[in-house]
Swiss-Prot record:
Name of the molecule in the record: Heme-copper oxidase subunit I+III
Taxonomic lineage of the native organism: Archaea, Thermoproteota, Thermoprotei, Desulfurococcales, Desulfurococcaceae
Transmembrane segments: 26-46, 71-91, 105-125, 157-177, 197-217, 242-262, 281-301, 314-334, 339-359, 380-400, 419-439, 463-483, 580-600, 637-657, 683-703, 708-728, 736-756, 758-778, 791-811
Residue(s) of cross-link: 1'-histidyl-3'-tyrosine (His-Tyr): 248-252
Membrane-related topology note: Multi-pass membrane protein
Annotated gene: aoxB
Pfam families on file: COX1, COX3
Amino acid sequence: MVSRLRGFLAWVYRWITTTDHKDIGLLYLVTSIAFLLIAGSLALLFRVQLAIPKSNFLTGDAYYEAVTVHGLIMLLWFASPFAFGLANYIVPLQIGARDLAFPRLNALSYWLYLLSGLVLLASFFTESGAPNVGWTLYAPLTARIYTPGIGLDLAALAIFLFSLSVTLGTINFLVTIAAMRAPGIGWFKMPMFTWSILFTVILMLWAFPPLMVGGALLLLDRNLGTEFFLNPAGGALLWDHLFWFFGHPEVYILLFPALGAMADVISTFSGKPIYAKRYILTAFLIATIISFVVWMHHMFITGTNIYTRLFYSITTILISIPFEMAVMSFIFTLYKGRLVYTVPMLFAVGALLNFIIGGSTGVYLGSIAIDRGFRGTYWVVAHFHYILVGTVTLGLIAGLYYWWPKITGRTYSERLGKIHFALAMLGVALTFLPQFALMDMPRRYFTYDIPEWVPLNQLSTLGAFIFGGSMAIGLVNFLYSLVKGGSAAPNPWNSWTLEWFTNSPPPKHNFDGVPVVRKDNTVVFVSEEALSKYGKDAIVEGRVDVSNVPLSGGQSHSSHGLTHHGTTDPLVLAAGLTLALFGLFVSKPLSYLGAIVFLLSLARWLWKDVKNVFAEELPGYVEHWPFPKDKIRSAMWVFIASEVATFGSIFSAYFFIRFNPVGKFLTEAWPPGYLVHDVNVGLINTIILFTGTMLFTLAYLGVKRDNYLITLSGLLGTLFMAIYFLTVKYFEWKELLIAGLGLDAGMYMQAYYVTTGAHALHVILGVLATTYLLVKLFNGNLRGRQALSEVLAVGIYWGIVEIVWTLVFPLYYLV
């Protein structure tokens, strides 16, 4: 009994300390499926409610709670995390990497994802219940006067934590794909699934910051008395802009991984490379760009300028063209192919058919006139569910069936899989096709008494239960596979992408030797010694015969650092942060406890970095063009890109509020900054910040020349200037508050405090980073190429902090 308990505890400890990308991928998959079961159960509840007119199965509040949480989970906590479960496991294998660039950040991203979802679900157990304002969280319904209690606060907090998780994951995947590809894997030799994840994380990089900013402003409105979404100067339209600038790219964030998985599946089981791959990748790139200029088609009926509506109508129709190209590519790949109708192939083709239906019905909504008629009806519900359920969910299930033998080393029942597919397709059709005919039924009614709607709603409810049953069959199939499934061969599908060139499941180090993809597309495995001896280019070009060169397997994967990658730090850090923020709404002592845990865990994390416990440099043979072979600097540039979106959202809100004619007419005038603030104080802080940045340049030169005194002087000078800046800012705020210019002094002061507060928070993070470098210097570890990368990364960070201030100063102190 004791030995079993010890074994169980060891098993639990392994999973809570793992940083291996394959383990993290499995955690994402299992957790996202659990969230799917919750969201699906909520959907069945409100479908039962709608099956009968004047039903009392659910109260109005219960119905709206179910719809709201269902939508949020499906949008945020199921589809993307499921895709990233597959991506965590498969992408490093497809590009020949040992792991993601930052294994601990990968684990931290997962734990933040899990805990954010639990925070959302915790809202059900509050006195006010879960949020019931709809998954779009439209203002002004979200104001405390209309939605009291902490349920909505917890939902906003959950979204904030989830967005933080996404940011960390985005950095990790972009750096991994850009700078850790095995020799010979150029950009166009990457499989479609890896390409789709690359486009996805690029979208995430700029789509999630507006949501995070919007969520933060919502929490301020509800808890500190600001009026960003209540005052007519901001109001519902400001929320619409922030939410939908995230919301429409989110559609493609969900769609791209499914299309990538479908492409790999269709290519494999057609026996042909994907048709016109380079053109499709170009189309996906164009779609990625256009996706950021279509969000206002969700706002056609808000009274925006007719020419603005016309522009967004055109972009909405234009963005369909890249996806039409993808559909044609898949069809031409299938045409005259050696088709093998396996379970993953059936799901991929079924998802393709659903995509045609969902996509074509969405194009109608690009018309301003048609959108006016369909907006807020079940036509829209049917359209986006054909995309999100019929295409995204089934496409990702195709990927799961496809890679299941690789992930588990087990086979599954083809018969159960085909039953799963048939019922899923039937369920999608019965659930959502009737809803196109319900184009005159408002989508947010919890009951109705119109007889003509009854048969269609009952068909839809029947379809929902059939679809739910199909998912249960799929789950049984996977569980059966784990218990009774036969052993899977390393490459059961005779595929040609790199993940199939290792065992099923892969070993901890992924590959025995370093995979090299030669110019003729053959794959060889060599040791790191051979790469160093013969050179990467010679092996890739086939000028060297490596068939008899030993792999030296133990050495070739030692750089993965498996012996010391296990750590509880990501879990404890995520738990501390979540507890600290959760406690603000539930219990202040809980918040204090969480803050202590967070700070201690962060200190422990950074101390290990000071001691270079996890320090790893990229091997010299990786493909990284055109990016630097420096993952720390690359990660900082990616983070800076997300910061551009974050502060871009804040400044966009500033301009929207300041120049909104409705706000000017109904509210107080926006005063010139020089009448409110002392320009000299702003100028002094500008000089302080610029001086600190120049001193940091001195520190960089000191590390580069290995000069301790110059480095110390530069870092201490930067730290002093940053603290001086914060001190000046503190006394400036204090004087404003004494003068009665607090958050209750109007939108101008609210915008000022939010903008300068966000900037000050970034200065504090800079202080933390500079202190870390100082501690590392005192410990004698701030030297060499790794240290130079860290110093340069922190210098880049100080640069963006300085640039933001050059915008804050004139906007709030001069004009």
